[in-house]
């Protein structure tokens, strides 16, 4: 009976250690994924800001071109 208790205790102990290691690895993976998501979000924000800047510049250039054509037409 004592042998069974020791064996059961050993199995439970090893199971807890294994579970603990798996949980730690899972947390590390989640942290890495969050960091990657943060980096991707930052890249998206910078990309959108560049697109907005380009659109604003193109809009201003188009407005200036149209204004120039209208002014030439009036003369």
From Swiss-Prot:
It is found in: Secreted. InterPro entries: Dermaseptin_dom, Frog_antimicrobial_propeptide, FSAP. GO terms for cellular component: extracellular region. Pfam families: DD_K, FSAP_sig_propep. Expressed by the skin glands. Keywords: Amidation, Amphibian defense peptide, Antibiotic, Antimicrobial, Cleavage on pair of basic residues, Secreted, Signal. Its main location: secreted. Possesses a potent antimicrobial activity against Gram-positive and Gram-negative bacteria. Probably acts by disturbing membrane functions with its amphipathic structure. Residues 1-22 form the signal peptide. The modification Glutamine amide is found at residue 72. Residues 23-43, 74-75 form a propeptide. Belongs to the frog skin active peptide (FSAP) family. Dermaseptin subfamily. This is Dermaseptin-A3.
């Amino acid at each position: 009976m004592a042998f069974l208790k020791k064996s059961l205790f050993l199995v439970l102990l090893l199971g807890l250690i294994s579970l603990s290691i798996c949980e730690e690895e899972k947390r590390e993976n989640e942290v890495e994924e969050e960091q990657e998501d943060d980096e991707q979000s930052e890249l998206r924000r910078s990309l959108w800001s560049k697109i907005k800047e380009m659109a604003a510049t193109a809009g201003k250039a188009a407005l200036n071109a149209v204004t120039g054509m209208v002014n030439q037409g009036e003369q």
